[in-house]
A protein has these predicted regions:
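Acidic loop->beta-strand submotif enriched in PP2C/PPM serine/threonine phosphatases
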Residues: 66-86
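Cytochrome P450 core scaffold surrounding the K-helix E-X-X-R motif
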Residues: 66-69, 94-97, 174-182
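Glycine-aromatic micro-motifs
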Residues: 10-11, 109-127, 135-146, 151, ...
Length: 280
């Protein structure tokens, strides 16, 4: 279902990430070079074009609606304007065997007032980016569905390498949600390097306030990004819990960085603070 990569910095994206983007999405590559706002259309196999310090927005296509070919490679011009649109997702009510859904949407939205675009696109559970080649600007829509890693925005995470996740609650061994980590690699046990408030009210809640509470006990797993997306759905990221990177001191003494979920809406005021969940 495609991937959009937004790299508006001078860093390089790991070659393995670019290669996987090409393999998973083999049906066309569109590139907007953000230093010139020139657009390039090519085959996905030419992903090495992105092995550069230049800033860009790239769209690797996985065809679900419309034929495979450069004519259906994103981004698409919106009418006769200087605006172009790319999408990660599928709108089944648009497009046909020849023309992809995003191409139809680009023509459709070009007839609407520019100020209405955000509201129109937010009705779809897809990720969008529009680019104005005259003003040299771009806009991300449904940004909460994107993931930012090392300063780069990704519309899907299945092209990214595995990451570390520290879990302190029902995702630990012996608890109900551990099933989501059954295919992940257990790295070991440790504690948060900084102190955080952990409260327990039937379920555990870790609060993002450093130097309050305890060094909380966690289990660390190496997970792929499809699993990470499952964890995000379970935890209601980024609204109920929010995933953030913190340092974990492993029992072996090793210090590593891992994603940990912090509750967003609850207060720990006047509540008992714990070191661990389970056997507490």
């Amino acid at each position: 279902m495609c991937v959009i990569i937004i790299k508006n910095n001078n860093n390089k994206i790991p070659n393995k990430t670019l290669q996987k983007s090409s393999v998973v999405n083999p049906h066309g590559l569109g590139i907007v070079w953000l230093d010139t706002y020139k657009i390039e259309y090519t085959d996905s196999k030419n992903y090495s074009r992105l092995d550069t310090n230049r800033p860009f927005i790239a769209h690797f296509r996985y065809a679900t609606v419309g034929k495979v070919g450069l004519s259906n490679t994103h981004p698409f011009r919106c009418g006769k304007s200087h605006e172009y649109l790319m999408m990660n997702g599928t709108i089944r009510t648009l497009g046909n065997d020849r023309e992809c859904d995003t191409k139809v949407l680009a023509n459709k939205i070009s007839k609407k007032d520019r100020n209405e675009w955000k509201n129109i696109l937010s009705q779809y559970s897809c990720r969008f980016v529009s680019v104005n080649t005259k003003r040299k600007q771009y806009q991300i829509y449904n940004k909460d569905l994107f993931t930012k890693v090392d300063g780069v925005w990704y519309s899907k995470t299945n092209v990214l390498p595995s990451v570390y996740v520290g879990v302190y609650g029902t995702l630990k061994r012996g608890h109900g949600n551990h099933r989501l980590l059954m295919s992940s690699t257990f790295i070991g046990k440790g504690k948060t390097n900084d102190r955080y408030p952990l409260t327990i009210s039937s379920l555990p809640y870790l609060h993002k306030q450093e130097n309050v509470g305890h060094n909380v006990e966690v289990e660390v797993y190496k997970v792929d990004h499809p699993t990470l997306e499952q964890l995000d759905r379970l935890e209601g990221h980024p609204h109920f819990y929010k995933r953030e990177v913190i340092e974990i001191r492993m029992n072996s003494g090793r210090l590593l960085s891992a994603w940990v979920y912090f509750v967003q809406s609850r207060s720990h005021k006047n509540e008992k603070l714990y070191k661990r969940y389970g056997g507490h």
